[in-house]
Design a protein with these regions (language model features):
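ATP-dependent carboxylate-amine ligase
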Residues: 1-18, 22-30, 42-46, 67, ...
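Conserved RecA-like helicase motor-core motifs
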Residues: 10, 110-117, 231, 397
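Short, polar loop motifs at secondary-structure junctions
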Residues: 12-15, 33-35, 50-53, 74, ...
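Phosphate-binding loop of NTP-binding sites
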Residues: 23, 37-38, 50-211, 215-226, ...
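Short loop/edge segments at beta-strand edges and connector loops
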Residues: 31-33, 71-73, 117-119, 209-211, ...
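Short, ordered beta-strand-loop transition motifs
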Residues: 134, 138, 242-248, 311-312
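Acidic-glycine-rich active-site phosphate/pyrophosphate-binding loop
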Residues: 145, 241-260
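Histidine-centered acyl-transfer/condensation active-site motif
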Residues: 263-264
Length: 439
């Protein structure tokens, strides 16, 4: 739309913050995938998301009529990313946060990047924009574009990972473990897709790679033609995040030398490592590490990443996108580090495709171990959540009814408690229901 096009979209089960962002931008959203939409709109092209499948009436009508269509990643590559310096952030976890940090670092240093991020960074209030006018080049246009690089498949007609379309000059490989069990058979299958991404980065580009990850080491062993900078390597070389002080501030080190200090209040080692990766990638784009660290002092996290939704009668309710056991464990640990001995009431909806398959249900108890109480939502699962949470004993409960879950949380909550809601969906508006019931 910023490029001058009229944009109309269709989807189902759209929820905030994306639904409210579309409304604020004046972009019409049609609910569902019925063929009758073609009588209302006659687009020049249909950009097909990977949620669309054969058999959906709208897609069948598009094919029957021979109407032009493409995938989202392909459209981006041809119409937005072509000719630009693309900085891509890939990995199982932390893509949205790290992309937001990187975009903000470039913005704060006058580089006016474009970006496409799978969340809404608070510093920008939108999830995407075209490049702007750099401070150093009045009247010009920034060459930089930051993109969250997802390994999920592109579309029903293109089963490659989305990120192979993006052709980055700078790429962060943040971490890599098994996920997306609905489309990948095992971890080696995902490693192959990351290898394909590495193949697209030019020899004059840069790879910023988590040095702790054996899976990423295997990816690079299959072939790498680009200079590599590591972060978090066990030997202490490359980029490192120092220990955080009581305020959450920490030093950024490169080959043992302190090159900057980040002064913020974000919690958790995972965010320190996200920051170091962003600082390293920004340096490749010309930003000095000390300037990147200074920018992060003004970084506001992404919506749905430990976002405080409200506090009522001494009970604080958080919203977080965590849905993979590793992300759940990291989120709970981060909150524990912040709140000390305060009780954490974890409220979980395992609704990702991987979790719906039950592939990682055995890992849930360990991921929730640091919570004082656990309230799980059974809705939509084909496996027994209560049985999966049984190793947690009496501190865990499972509910098939959302109102019953809310009532149980409210009955348990005491002043000083921290209610941590984790889901990658709308969760039936549970945050608002909790806050209303707590009042």
């Amino acid at each position: 739309r910023a490029a001058g096009h009229t944009v109309t979209g269709c989807d189902q089960n759209v929820y905030p913050p994306m639904s409210t962002q579309l409304e604020a931008l004046g972009i019409e959203l049609i609910e569902g995938f019925e063929a009758g939409q073609l009588e209302r709109v006659q687009p020049d092209i249909f950009v097909v998301g990977n949620v669309v499948k054969r058999g959906m009436p709208l897609m069948e009508a598009i094919l029957d009529r021979g109407l032009p269509y493409t995938s989202g990643p392909q459209w981006l590559a041809e119409n937005v990313l072509a000719g630009r310096w693309v900085l891509a952030v890939a990995g199982t976890h932390g893509k949205t946060t790290t992309s937001s940090m990187l975009a903000w670092i470039l913005e704060a240093n006058g580089l006016a990047p474009g970006f496409l991020i799978g969340g809404i960074p608070e510093n920008f209030a939108v999830s995407a924009r075209l490049p702007g006018e750099p401070a150093q080049e009045p009247g010009g246009e920034s060459p930089f574009f930051v993109i969250e690089a997802d390994e999920y498949d592109t579309a029903f007609f293109d089963k490659r990972s989305k990120f192979v379309h993006y052709h980055p000059r700078t790429a962060i490989l943040n971490n890599l473990e098994f996920d997306h069990a609905d489309i990948f058979a095992d971890l080696p299958a995902i490693e192959t897709q990351f290898h394909h991404l590495v193949r697209t980065v030019p020899g004059t580009g840069r790879l910023v790679v988590n040095g702790r990850e054996a899976s990423l080491a295997r990816v690079l062993e299959r072939g790498c033609w680009t200079p590599v900078e590591t972060f978090a390597a066990p030997a202490g070389s490359g980029w490192q995040a120092g220990e955080a002080d009581d305020d959450g501030h920490f030093d950024v080190l490169l080959d043992g030398d302190t090159v900057g200090r980040v002064r913020w209040n974000l919690m958790g080692e995972h965010n320190r490592l996200n920051a170091v990766a962003a600082v390293a990638a920004a340096r490749h784009a010309g930003v000095r590490p000390q300037d990147a660290c200074a920018a992060l002092a003004m970084f506001a996290n992404v919506k749905r990443r430990m976002e405080v939704k409200g506090s009522v009668n001494g009970v604080t309710v958080y919203d977080d996108f965590a849905h993979h056991p590793t992300a759940i464990a990291t989120t709970v640990a981060g909150l524990r580090a912040r709140v000390g001995t305060a009780r954490i009431l974890a409220v979980l909806e395992p609704r990702s495709n991987t979790m719906k398959l039950g592939t990682m249900k055995a890992e849930l108890p360990a991921s929730l171990a640091q919570a004082d109480r656990v309230f799980g939502y059974q809705g939509g699962l084909g496996w027994d959540l209560a049985a999966a949470l049984a190793p947690l004993g009496d501190k865990a409960q499972s509910f098939g009814d959302l109102d019953a879950l809310v009532a149980a949380v409210v009955a348990e909550a005491q002043p000083g408690d921290q209610v941590l809601v984790m889901s990658n969906g709308g969760f039936g508006g549970v945050h608002g229901k909790l806050l209303a019931a707590l009042a």
